[in-house]
Design a protein with these regions (language model features):
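Membrane-embedded helix-loop-helix hairpins and adjacent transmembrane boundary segments
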Residues: 1-534
Length: 534
């Protein structure tokens, strides 16, 4: 049997076992949506890290660094710094005021139906963007490993089915433990791969960085080029490159605090103190991991080479090909299985956040106006919606094809989260005057601005030469109207402006009256949701 397939099957068997165990403990909404709020701080911290260290991190960032050096490393810096926003601003108030979703915080003192409807739409949009990136990575990875045994489309469908199984049967508890197992494996594999890279250079940083400054590759004209990968400019070139880099940084740093699948993790712990504790655990793991992406990306550039990577799966396969070059096919299979585990864990987290938002926010509190529903209906709706969300993600990933860089796709999801979700969360918690009109306007403007600018950016809009065919061609064959690849530098301020203007042109005395209650609860935890009894 193909050793890669064997390792895949072993991991799938382990995770299905976890799902079966969790399914026996996921009775009731609190157990299904929030794991009974009984996850310990260190467990949730590892799970948060597992949720955050996605295919974009392991496959995408390594690939961008391998091809674009210093500019690619800026992705690592942005994702690393981002958790300071979560720790200092979001984690404690969110845990104290919410129940299952981001919209719970907004609905605490605002009119629930309009804010939940818009927040649910935003959650589904961000989750779908993020999920598509993971599915693209999964399809490309499995196709590379198993060769002619499966097609890219079949690989994407298989991952989608597994994702749906985890969520439908295991809920948040299964998702949490799949993420913990995956995070431990990913850290172990990344540490080992980093050590092997440095061993290749005799543990000499001088040799390592010397090799990086002399990376050789062929450009689009077929000319061999030697470039210093430690210098900026390979990706972000003048005149708009510096602005694009700032825009990327804004999206990554502020987007994390608006990612639905990260925010819902803080509802799985008993209290706000444990939520803060879990963020510290996550930051230690995430910080270590993103430092090591330097070794993975630059190691792939110097040891494997951009030309070889381009001809064997593209940028997303840089880390697995590095493992193969350093330690042969068995280690290649092991690292690829870890990458596969990474994808499965993250898509499960994304799906549970999307289905929870649809079921709890839209179905129960918008369609049925918060009326008491029969026991188990909310969970049943979430399980059914998992099939719909999974099907949409599978379809779009198949249309995009295996060549899209997953780190870049995820960066766009961060831009949408930072533009739509973060402004309304921050203003709801910290601004007394903030009201329902401001929340709805902020969410709508943030969503429309970020998605609209993405559609008319060079990411999707460009005139390709006739030699570029298939999925490599841009979606819209015209000159881009917006010069930056990432819209964050414009769409994030627009999200805040929309929320502020919407608030100032309307009045809602009840929202202001409930602000003191929200302030006390968000800072003290009085009245916060308690852990479920078992």
């Amino acid at each position: 049997m193909n050793i890669s397939l064997l390792m895949f099957l072993i991991f799938i068997a382990i995770t299905l076992g976890i799902t079966y165990w969790a399914s026996r403990r996921s009775a009731g909404a609190a157990a299904y949506f929030a794991a009974g709020r009984q996850i310990k701080g260190w467990q949730n911290g590892i799970a948060v890290a597992g949720d955050y260290m996605s295919a974009a991190s392991f496959l995408g960032i390594a690939g961008i660094i391998a091809f674009q050096g210093y500019d690619g490393f800026m992705f690592s810096v942005g994702w690393l710094v981002a958790y300071l926003t979560v720790l200092l601003v979001i984690a404690e108030p969110l845990r104290n005021t919410g129940k299952y979703t981001m919209a719970d915080v907004l609905a605490y003192r605002l009119k629930p139906r309009p804010v939940r409807a818009m927040a649910s739409l935003s959650t589904l949009t961000v989750s779908t963007f993020y999920m598509i990136a993971q599915m693209v990575g999964a399809g490309a990875l499995v196709k590379l490993l198993l060769g002619n045994m499966v097609t890219y489309n079949e690989a994407v469908i298989a991952v989608g089915i597994l994702m749906i199984v985890y969520v439908v049967f295991g809920g948040m508890l299964a998702t949490t433990w799949v993420q913990i197992v995956k995070a431990v494996l990913l850290m172990a594999g990344t540490i080992l791969l980093s050590i092997l890279v440095m061993a290749h250079f005799h543990f000499s940083f001088g040799q390592f960085f010397g090799a990086i400054s002399q990376v050789s590759y062929h450009d689009v004209k077929g000319t061999q080029v030697v470039r210093d990968f430690l210098q900026p400019g390979l990706r972000y070139k003048p005149p708009y490159g510096p602005l694009d880099l700032i825009s990327l940084g804004m999206a990554l740093i502020f987007g994390t605090a608006g990612l639905p699948h990260i925010l819902v993790r803080f509802y799985t712990v008993p209290d706000a103190k444990t939520a803060r504790h879990s963020v510290v655990w996550a930051m230690v793991l995430i910080g270590s991991f993103y430092i090591m992406t330097t070794f993975l990306g630059f190691g792939a550039a110097t040891i494997v080479g951009p030309d070889y990577i381009k001809g064997h799966g593209g940028t997303n396969m840089s880390a697995p090909l590095l493992a193969q070059a350093l330690a042969g096919n068995i280690f290649f299979a092991f690292i690829s299985a870890i990458a596969f585990a990474t994808i499965l864990a993250v898509v499960a987290g994304l799906t549970i956040s999307a289905t929870t938002s649809f079921s709890h926010d839209f179905w129960t509190n918008v369609i049925h106006n918060g009326e008491e529903r029969r026991a188990g209906e909310e969970v049943l709706v979430a399980r059914i919606s998992a099939f719909v969300v999974g099907g949409v993600a599978i379809g779009i990933a198949i249309v995009l094809g295996p060549t899209a860089n997953v780190a870049f796709l995820v960066a766009l999801a961060f831009a949408v989260a930072a533009s739509a979700n973060l402004p309304v969360i921050v203003l709801s918690i910290f601004w007394r005057r903030f009201n329902t009109a401001g929340a709805v306007t902020g969410l709508a403007v943030g969503l429309l601005a970020s998605i609209g600018l993405i559609l008319v950016s060079p990411s999707l809009m460009a005139i390709d030469p006739p030699t570029v065919v298939g999925t490599a061609r841009h979606l819209i064959q015209a000159k881009a109207w917006f010069p930056l690849e990432n819209p964050g530098i414009l769409s994030i301020p627009l999200g805040f402006i929309g929320a502020i203007v919407g608030t100032l042109i309307s009045s809602e005395p009840t929202a202001q009256e409930k602000f003191n209650e929200l302030l006390v609860r968000s800072n003290t935890g009085l009245g916060a949701e308690k852990a479920a009894a078992h």
